[in-house]
Swiss-Prot record:
<dbReference type="GO" id="GO:0006974">
    <property type="term" value="P:DNA damage response"/>
</dbReference>
<dbReference type="InterPro" id="IPR044862">
    <property type="entry name" value="Pro_4_hyd_alph_FE2OG_OXY"/>
</dbReference>
<feature type="binding site">
    <location>
        <position position="96"/>
    </location>
    <ligand>
        <name>Fe cation</name>
    </ligand>
</feature>
<feature type="binding site">
    <location>
        <position position="98"/>
    </location>
    <ligand>
        <name>Fe cation</name>
    </ligand>
</feature>
<dbReference type="Pfam" id="PF18331">
    <property type="entry name" value="PKHD_C"/>
</dbReference>
<feature type="binding site">
    <location>
        <position position="157"/>
    </location>
    <ligand>
        <name>Fe cation</name>
    </ligand>
</feature>
<keyword id="KW-0408">Iron</keyword>
<keyword id="KW-0847">Vitamin C</keyword>
<dbReference type="GO" id="GO:0005506">
    <property type="term" value="F:iron ion binding"/>
</dbReference>
<feature type="domain" description="Fe2OG dioxygenase">
    <location>
        <begin position="78"/>
        <end position="176"/>
    </location>
</feature>
<keyword id="KW-0479">Metal-binding</keyword>
<dbReference type="InterPro" id="IPR005123">
    <property type="entry name" value="Oxoglu/Fe-dep_dioxygenase_dom"/>
</dbReference>
<dbReference type="InterPro" id="IPR006620">
    <property type="entry name" value="Pro_4_hyd_alph"/>
</dbReference>
<keyword id="KW-0223">Dioxygenase</keyword>
<dbReference type="Pfam" id="PF13640">
    <property type="entry name" value="2OG-FeII_Oxy_3"/>
</dbReference>
<dbReference type="GO" id="GO:0006879">
    <property type="term" value="P:intracellular iron ion homeostasis"/>
</dbReference>
<dbReference type="InterPro" id="IPR023550">
    <property type="entry name" value="PKHD_hydroxylase"/>
</dbReference>
Length: 224
């Protein structure tokens, strides 16, 4: 399941974030790569311990945890804190699948879901599409600045070469309360239906029944 979430941050907020990020020292992105990824990856990143990156990462996580669509789709349990990358001058990241487990200072995170928050407007750079291969085929993603795409970490994906301009983004992984992607999809569809029926003033009994089904399935499938 691939979900696009528009306007996580406003244009004004993105401009402020970019001013802070652009002023930092960017390093070779392969300093965070495994052996296989290092042969396919050419980009720049901020150090994971950069204080500004950490501060903005906290802001991103807080914003996402307050976003109903993100919470409904991801059912987040634990984040691997956001990182920041930049592509320019032909830089690219060829097809790969993200590592299954990530280590943080607080323990291990199983990467159930990956997310990219775009911080460059699509008309300011050429190339740089996030191409994701999933059960519905290949999808090419290039969103407005401030918008986010969420997709299963099991997906084969790449960032195509940026042939002009500059593509800056935040990327992150998270462990969901529900490990299985198919179960998460069913819960998401059910939750969206409940919200739609609520907006249509459906009968109270119908909503009680559906909400009960949702929470009983979540109780059965969740791992905490």
């Amino acid at each position: 399941m691939l979900i696009e979430i528009p306007n996580v941050f406003s244009k004004e907020e993105v401009n402020q974030l970019r001013e802070e990020l652009d002023a930092r020292t960017w390093i070779d992105g392969n300093q965070t790569s495994g052996v296989m990824a290092s042969t396919r990856k050419r980009n720049q990143q901020l150090d994971k311990d950069d204080p500004v990156a950490l501060q903005i990462g906290e802001l991103i996580m807080a914003r996402l945890l307050a976003h109903p669509l993100f919470v409904s789709a991801a059912l987040p349990l634990q984040f691997y804190p956001p990182l920041f990358n930049r592509y320019q001058g032909g830089e690219t990241f060829g097809y790969h699948i993200d590592n299954a487990i990530r280590s943080t200072s607080e323990g291990m995170v199983r990467t159930d879901l990956s997310a990219t928050l775009f911080l460059s407007e699509p008309d300011t750079y050429q190339g740089g599409e996030l191409v994701i291969q999933d059960t519905y085929g290949q999808q090419s993603i290039k969103l407005a600045a401030g918008s986010l795409v969420l997709y299963p970490s099991t997906s084969l994906h790449q960032v195509t070469p940026v042939t002009s301009g500059e593509r800056t983004a935040a990327f992150m992984w998270l462990q969901s309360m529900v490990r299985d992607e198919g179960q998460r999809r069913l819960l998401f569809q059910l939750d969206q239906s409940i919200q739609a029926l609520t907006a249509q003033a459906a009968s109270e009994q119908e909503l009680f029944n559906l909400t009960g089904v949702y929470h009983n399935l979540l109780r059965r499938w969740s791992e905490l």
